[in-house]
């Protein structure tokens, strides 16, 4: 039996179970622009169509002025690899992936309220690689980061 840490809310952390395309979940957040807000979404947007992601990001940028959204993404070429290796490899035949980011700067064009769009390396950008991963694995990690096959994107709203 596996034991998982419970997701608990605190004064600074709040979890919402919802349909992201129904933006009524915005109303569940006691948001004050002077306090700021950061949204983290890991492994989420791959499964959304680009038009749905654009609508969501635009609505978030307008509603959460002064906030930030941090999420992971891949290039279009990376989606094909993801579909082939991850999803089909685990026999997830009914699942598809759609959303990718080839040029992070195009995200700013979606809304005048997106003031900054920055791409950071996914595997090497926040923690240095070390010997425990092995030589070949470190080379693969560096390639994935340099090619933007894996990236962490930060959007700032104003």
Task: Indicate where each model-derived feature is located.
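Alpha-helical subdomain
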Residues: 2-158
């Amino acid at each position: 039996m596996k034991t998982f840490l419970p997701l608990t809310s605190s004064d600074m952390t709040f979890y919402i179970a919802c349909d992201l395309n129904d933006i009524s979940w915005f109303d569940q957040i006691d948001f004050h622009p002077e306090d700021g807000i950061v949204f983290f979404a890991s492994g989420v947007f791959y499964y959304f169509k680009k038009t749905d992601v654009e609508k969501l990001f635009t609505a978030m940028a307008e509603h959460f002025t002064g906030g930030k959204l941090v999420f992971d993404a891949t290039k279009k070429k990376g989606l094909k690899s993801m579909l082939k290796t991850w999803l089909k490899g685990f026999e997830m035949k009914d699942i598809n992936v759609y959303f990718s980011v080839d040029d992070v700067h195009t995200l700013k064009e979606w809304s005048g309220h997106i003031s900054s769009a920055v791409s950071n390396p996914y595997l090497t950008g926040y923690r240095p690689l070390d010997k425990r991963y092995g030589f070949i694995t470190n080379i693969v990690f560096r390639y994935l980061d340099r090619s933007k096959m894996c990236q962490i994107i930060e959007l700032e709203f104003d």
